[in-house]
Amino acid sequence: MKKGISVILAVLLAVSCLTGLSGCGSSKKTTLYVYNWGQYISEGDDGSLDVIAAFEEAYPNIRVQYSTYDSNEIMYSKLSNGGITVDVIIPSDYMIGRMVQEGMLEELNFSNIPNYQYIDDSFKNTSYDPENKYSVPYTWGTVGIIYNTKYVDPADVTGWELLWNEKYAGKILMFDNSRDAFGIAEYLLGYDVNTTDEAELQACSAKLAEQKPVVQQYVMDQIFDAMENEEAWIAPYYAGDYLTMVEENPDLAFYRPTAQGYNMFIDAMCIPTCCQEKEAAEAFINFLCSPEISSANMEFLGYSVPSTAAKELMDPEVAGSEVAYPDADTLTTGTSFNFLPEETSRYMESLFMEVRNG
């Protein structure tokens, strides 16, 4: 894919000049505020495509102001508190459902997003956006356990209980967000990962408190340095990010606890109601849906692409990765997080903070 970057840009520049927002014949200057997960877009490292630079080249009168967050909850809190301008966000499925219900997302004008045609039908009509009004899938993936084969006995890698194993005390990392952390406890205890039962949530909290003595630290993006540099040996995290880490440390392996269950997610591009530049935001979303851009972006990130047209352009080794694209039988053992009632979300968050900070 790297050798085709100049061709990609030439094609996209030609196409963009046919659109009203390309800037090819316009003098209006626009700043587009994009708020995304950390390490979640190809930035031109190691000869990869710099997606933001490519967009700004295709749309010379749009300047992207790019900032990042570590969790859905941080993003939600920042937007719900108000007082900021954000034009594009990329929340996860359950958070999209919450934001739709609370009136925090704009309906999209799909006439400005013709590349939506390349999104596979299996990623449309979802539970969180059943009428396809508010979101365009960006990536999908699964959660599993990353472990270092130099230090972890494979006989111990049998399920989520590995994250509680005292043999590896001080070398275990844990998610620093309530939904993912509670999800693991729910899988381990055999509960529905979308439970609203307070007794079950309390049991999960107790299980996480039981784990705390063996946890080195609660992390999100900090996991990269910790696992790559062998400061930690075991951590739950996203399959796409594992594929980035293993390039830096080939002793890392990935395990999905299929017998107990694991989270399968979709992250999608949305426009919040605080947006000031909706057409530019839709142009950005459309740009990222281009098979050429999407394939180059996801090939670098390691995340799974929700577009067969894009996948067909990727390096066959990447597109054939079982970690990124598990088989149908494996996928049947994964479950998705649904939007929880506000009182449940707040209760879960308070329980998690008690564990984390207690």
Give the label of every model feature segment.
Residues 106-117, 135, 251-263, 272-275:
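Short beta-strand->loop
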Residues 28-98, 225:
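Early extracytoplasmic/lumenal segment of secretory-pathway proteins
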